Amino acid sequence: MERRTLLVVLLVCSCVVAAAAEASPSRWPSPGRPRPFPGRPNPIFRPRPCICVRQPCPCDTYGGNRW
């Protein structure tokens, strides 16, 4: 009985540790993702040009650029 309880406790602890590791952000970058150089500025994302099909134009509310 004692051995069974110990196994259950170990199983629960390992599940809790795995869930905590999954939820917390990783301190180390994943090897599959390329890391930007330290001196490199972040890329500037330009808004997509918006093509209005219906009125009122949704571009006015979202702040996109009209063509």
UniProtKB/Swiss-Prot annotation:
It comes from the Eukaryota. One of its GO terms (biological process) is immune system process. Keywords: Antibiotic, Antimicrobial, Disulfide bond, Immunity, Signal. Disulfide bonds join C50-C59, C52-C57. Mainly expressed in hemocytes. No or very low expression in heart, gills, inestines, and epidermis. Residues 31-44 have a biased composition (Pro residues). Disulfide bonds are important for activity especially against Gram-negative bacteria, since the linearization of the peptide causes a strong decrease of activity on these bacteria. Coiled coil: none annotated. Antimicrobial peptide that has a large activity spectrum with activity against Gram-positive, Gram-negative bacteria, as well as against fungi. Shows activity at micromolar concentrations. Displays minimal inhibitory concentration (MIC) values lower than minimal bactericidal concentrations (MBC). May have a dual mode of action depending on the peptide concentrations. At MIC concentrations, the peptide penetrates into the cytoplasm of target cells (tested on the Gram-negative E.coli). The two inner membrane proteins YgdD and SbmA may be required for this uptake. This is Arasin 2.
